[in-house]
UniProtKB/Swiss-Prot annotation:
Name this polypeptide is given: Shikimate transporter
Family, as annotated: Belongs to the major facilitator superfamily. Metabolite:H+ Symporter (MHS) family (TC 2.A.1.6) family.
Catalytic activity: shikimate(in) + H(+)(in) = shikimate(out) + H(+)(out)
SUPFAM superfamilies, per database record: MFS general substrate transporter
GO biological processes: shikimate transmembrane transport
Organism encoding this protein: Escherichia coli (strain K12)
Role summary: Involved in the uptake of shikimate, an intermediate in the aromatic amino acid biosynthetic pathway.
Length: 438
């Protein structure tokens, strides 16, 4: 453990409360944009992309192809983490965070004007995959910078709460993306929605980008980063991601294991179940679109509340509680789907994608960033977080759809997949030492 770097912090009196608030607000605003854009793709892939961009294959294969393009974004997230992390550790967090918002917004808006397969043939899916890769690259650099700036700027005993805006941005992004798709879906016919209605939410991203850039322009670099740069100005530096790998190789594996619960609970409910419930169960698409609205809205309240509890009672306790709730809800969720019981579908969707998910993500910012020294923290935490996204989340809808296809529509294998991921996260958190309070 690099005790010298990790324990080196600016005096608490130098931490400006106004700087902390601006960092929290800026991290939140950018996270809204990035997660709105990133999640919007998953929702639309479940409803539209199989027919608009892959019409030449069977419905089942079209669904797999659409979810595969969803996973492409995750493959490029580690690369974004490496590149943005490298320059973020050298040049500063703020510069990189301005650039990630620009890249994400432009890629998303271009998807909104992308011609379909019937217009330009195979160029349509090729360009779709390219733009999805740019989305993944941009969001790969977003989390590390936003998490670090908010954690490093926060008061010592309120780091989970002040950095929770990064994850609240996820909830607002989910709320906006699902809400806008749901609204347009209700206002258009199926033909209109498939033709042009789905494009409107992608173009709306431009408005969010301009707002986020205005907010982020008022942020400052954290005092901790500035002090670290001063101390190491004359030192010979290795590439930050290499430094992180050499000093803390086990931290990357821990982050992957810890994130399984979060990734599986969210993407199975918001992406896979949306497709599975409509195509296999005959349930209306509005059901899971409305569930996404509910989950996103509740997350705006529950994430900061759980973060406050974590600051008060310990991060690990809150984390383990969330993973156990996810474990216990896996099979009941699919049983409710099979029974087509709306009340229990909604209830267990909230237990998985809201309660379990939010108890886990609310403490990830301080938990993950404190595994690394300040001079390579953007690279270490960012790359670890994004590699976990590939391993645990990027192909979750694809894997779940493949399991359903392989087992002829039987959902038990997907429930086991979800349960196992939650248990792995629980065991990893149980074996960790709470860096704040056990």
């Amino acid at each position: 453990m690099d005790s010298t770097l990790i324990s080196t912090r600016p005096d608490e009196g130098t931490l400006s409360l106004s700087r902390a608030r601006r960092a929290a607000l800026g991290s939140f605003a950018g996270a809204v944009v990035d997660w709105y854009d990133f999640l919007l793709y998953g929702i639309t892939a479940a409803l539209v992309f199989n027919r608009e961009f892959f019409p030449q294959v069977s419905p089942a294969m079209g669904t797999l192809a659409a979810f595969a393009t969803f996973g492409v974004g995750f493959l490029f997230r580690p690369l974004g983490g490496v590149i943005f992390g490298h320059f973020g550790d050298r040049l500063g967090r703020k510069r990189m965070l301005m650039l990630t918002v620009w890249m994400m917004g432009i890629a998303t808006a271009l998807i909104g004007i992308l011609p379909s397969f019937s217009t330009i043939g195979w160029w349509a899916p090729i360009l779709l995959v390219t733009l999805r890769a740019i989305q993944g690259f941009a969001v790969g650099g977003e989390w590390g910078g936003a998490a670090l700036l908010s954690v490093e700027s926060a008061p010592k005993n309120k780091k989970a709460f002040y950095s929770s805006g990064v994850q609240v941005g996820y909830g607002v992004g989910l709320l906006l993306s699902t809400g806008l798709v749901s609204l347009i879906s209700m206002m258009t016919t199926d033909e209109q929605f498939l033709s042009w209605g789905w494009r409107i939410p992608f173009l709306f991203s431009i408005v969010l980008v301009l707002g986020a850039l205005w907010v982020r322009n008022g942020m400052e670099e954290s005092a901790e980063f500035e002090q670290q740069q001063h101390y190491q100005a004359a030192a010979k530096k290795r590439i930050p991601v290499i430094e992180a790998l050499l000093r803390h190789p086990g931290a990357f594996l821990k982050i992957i294991a810890l994130r399984l619960c979060e990734l599986l609970t969210m993407y199975i409910v918001t992406a896979f179940a949306l497709n599975y419930s409509t195509q296999n169960m005959g349930l209306p698409r509005e059901l899971f679109l409305n569930i996404g609205l509910l989950v996103g809205g509740l997350s705006c309240l529950t994430i900061p509340c759980f973060a406050w509890l974590a600051d008060r009672f310990g991060r690990r306790r809150v984390y383990i509680t969330g993973t156990l709730i996810g474990t216990l809800s896996a099979f009941p969720f699919f049983m409710a789907l099979e029974a087509q019981s709306i009340f229990w579908i909604v209830f267990f969707s909230i237990m998985l994608a809201n309660i379990a998910h939010d108890m886990v993500v609310c403490v990830q910012q301080p938990m993950f960033t404190e595994m690394f020294g300040a001079s390579y923290r953007y690279s270490g935490a960012g790359v670890g977080y994004q590699v976990a996204s590939v391993v645990g989340g990027g192909f979750t809808p694809f894997i779940a759809a493949a399991l359903i296809t392989y087992f002829a529509g039987n959902w038990h294998s997907v429930a086991i997949y979800l349960l196992a991921g939650c248990l792995i996260s629980a065991m990893t958190a149980l074996l960790m030492k709470d860096s704040q309070r056990a």
